[in-house]
């Protein structure tokens, strides 16, 4: 069966997350509904996805895939039709054919997120639903010093929702993490790992901000990792500032082509 990967961008404020849910608007259901209309004579399988994002979380470059009974002859026509039929807040940016063994979730070797932070005393019209407003003073140098402690293969049990990890392995490898200062008021933390647990990025960034605020004198990322206890880490930030940026596939170079968005 032919196998196709889609590159999808979406505004999470419009949806109850990625995963299909009965009687609720989700990204998966909106794309599958559109595919069902477009490919009614060539039915598509259920979508697989690189990351099942929660309600309110956005995506700039999500990868998903589906299979059909017969080849799709015209990719341009498919993209135009998908974007006409999906609701406001979802854009399908590109499509490529991939090998039959490609699976958006299980073939993925790395995932990258950013968390956007607005750092100011005063409100901005562009923050609500798009970023987290940091109102108090932050020692950004102190935050930077903690970042590299997170890099590597570690047990991140302190940085995930406790109930979701009962009896599960909590070891993940953070491949890269950095603080990016885009302007005096705008920062973002970019984090890439081989996989993430529930709320892991939101708790990690919340903890880094608590450290930057000087909330703890004796607690550091090192000590929080050692504790393996969710109560030792910082707050879970809201989903507003979280964006899925990219999925990586070491064994599937065709995905590099997927991220080359066609220009007019």
Curated annotation (Swiss-Prot):
A Gene Ontology BP annotation from the UniProt entry: tRNA pseudouridine synthesis
Listed CDD domains: PseudoU_synth_EcTruA
Name of the protein in its database record: tRNA pseudouridine synthase A
Domain of life: Bacteria
Protein residues bound to substrate: 113
UniProt function note: Formation of pseudouridine at positions 38, 39 and 40 in the anticodon stem and loop of transfer RNAs.
E.C. code: 5.4.99.12
Species for this entry: Leptospira biflexa serovar Patoc (strain Patoc 1 / ATCC 23582 / Paris)
Sample GO molecular function, one term: tRNA pseudouridine(38-40) synthase activity
Keywords, sorted A to Z: Isomerase, tRNA processing
Any one Pfam family match given in the protein's UniProt record, by short name: PseudoU_synth_1
Catalyses which reaction(s): uridine(38/39/40) in tRNA = pseudouridine(38/39/40) in tRNA
Active site, per annotation: 54
Family: Belongs to the tRNA pseudouridine synthase TruA family.
Subunit structure: Homodimer.
């Amino acid at each position: 069966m032919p196998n196709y990967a889609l590159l999808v961008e979406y505004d999470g404020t419009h949806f109850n997350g990625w995963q299909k849910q009965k009687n609720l608007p989700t990204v998966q259901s909106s794309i599958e509904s559109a595919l069902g209309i477009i490919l009614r004579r060539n039915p598509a399988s259920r979508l697989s996805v690189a990351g099942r994002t929660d309600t309110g979380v956005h995506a700039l470059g999500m990868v998903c895939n589906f299979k059909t009974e017969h080849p799709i002859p015209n990719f341009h026509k498919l993209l135009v039709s998908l974007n006409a039929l999906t609701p406001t807040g979802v854009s399908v940016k590109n499509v490529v054919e991939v090998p039959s063994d490609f699976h958006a979730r299980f073939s993925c070797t790395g995932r990258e997120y950013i968390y956007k932070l607005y750092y100011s005393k005063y409100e901005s019209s562009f923050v609500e639903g798009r970023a987290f407003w940091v109102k108090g003073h932050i020692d950004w140098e102190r935050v930077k010093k903690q970042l590299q402690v997170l890099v590597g293969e570690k047990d991140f049990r302190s940085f995930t929702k406790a109930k979701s990890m009962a009896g599960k392995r909590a070891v993940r490898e953070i491949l890269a993490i950095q603080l990016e200062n885009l302007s005096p008021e705008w920062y973002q933390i970019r984090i890439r790992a081989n996989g993430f647990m529930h709320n892991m990025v939101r708790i990690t960034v919340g903890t880094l901000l608590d450290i930057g605020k000087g909330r703890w004198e004796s607690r550091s990322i090192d000590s929080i990792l050692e504790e393996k206890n969710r109560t030792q880490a910082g707050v879970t930030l809201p989903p507003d500032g979280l964006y899925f940026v990219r999925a990586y596939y070491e064994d599937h170079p065709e995905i590099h082509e997927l991220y080359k968005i066609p220009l007019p």
